[in-house]
Regions:
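A short, flexible loop at the N-terminus of ABC-type nucleotide-binding domains that lies
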Residues: 1-20, 24-26, 67
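The feature captures the beta-strand-to-loop junction immediately N-terminal to the Walker
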Residues: 31-33
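Helix N-cap at the start of a conserved alpha-helix in ABC-type nucleotide-binding domains
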Residues: 36, 158-160
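Helix-to-loop junction immediately C-terminal to a conserved catalytic motif
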Residues: 46
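Conserved ABC transporter NBD signature motif
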Residues: 54-65, 69-70
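ABC-family P-loop ATPase nucleotide-binding domains
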Residues: 76-135
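Catalytic Walker B motif of ABC-type/P-loop ATPase nucleotide-binding domains
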Residues: 147-151, 156
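Helical segment within the ABC ATPase nucleotide-binding domain
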Residues: 161-176
Length: 197
């Protein structure tokens, strides 16, 4: 599913050398303190930054050779980014439907209601926990084969964190051949969720 071999990135005062593998049907955790290179690894994996060395394979292809249809199989959550705060959940659903052929708008809106996320309210009016749940739901909504989740529980209270982790568990039960790569600096989150570190 995913193989990273000696991924290297160097900045002033920072040097990354990361190797890891994510197997089909597994949840793999990437743990480390803030500033250890978790987000850098994810950004390189997604082609958002250019690595200084190493190799990344996704779905058996080099990351730089992924085609748009391959990228459709990825679901992504970054802790420090998301949707325009001026959109509603229904507005996001319309955008997602135009991007992802496998996106089920009605299922997405039903899941929003299930997790008490109003579909007609602007995202900027959501609480921190609501925004986190919404980002994860959006990443899950098009039946991604590989979820890349960068600190999806950061800043959440215990109840919201448990809800997000349960969303991921349910997804894996329903999509047994999918995989998740999740990062966190909270070891208890990963210990309760992951098959591998």
């Amino acid at each position: 599913m995913l193989k990273i071999s000696h991924l290297q990135k160097h900045y002033r005062g920072f040097s990354l050398d990361c190797s890891m593998e994510v197997q089909p049907g597994m949840i793999t955790g990437l743990i480390g303190r803030n500033g250890s290179g978790k987000s850098t690894t994810f950004k390189a994996l997604l082609g958002l930054i250019h690595p200084d060395g190493g190799e990344i394979e996704v779905f058996g292809k080099k990351a730089e050779e992924l085609k748009p249809e391959d990228k459709q199989k990825l679901g992504v959550v970054f802790a420090d980014s998301g949707f325009s705060m001026y959109l509603t959940a229904a507005g996001v659903a319309n955008i997602m439907k135009s991007i992802y052929p496998d996106f089920d708008r009605e299922e997405f809106l039903q899941q929003c209601r299930r997790f008490n996320l109003p579909t007609d309210k602007k995202i900027k009016e959501f609480s921190t926990g609501m925004k986190a749940k919404f980002k994860v739901l959006a990443a899950l909504s098009h039946k991604a084969e590989l979820l890349i989740l960068d600190e999806p529980t950061v800043g959440l209270d215990v109840i919201a964190r448990d809800e997000v982790l349960n969303m991921l568990r349910e997804y894996m039960e329903e999509n047994v051949s999918s995989s998740i790569l999740i990062s966190s600096h909270i070891s208890s989150d990963l210990e309760s969720l992951c098959d591998d570190f």
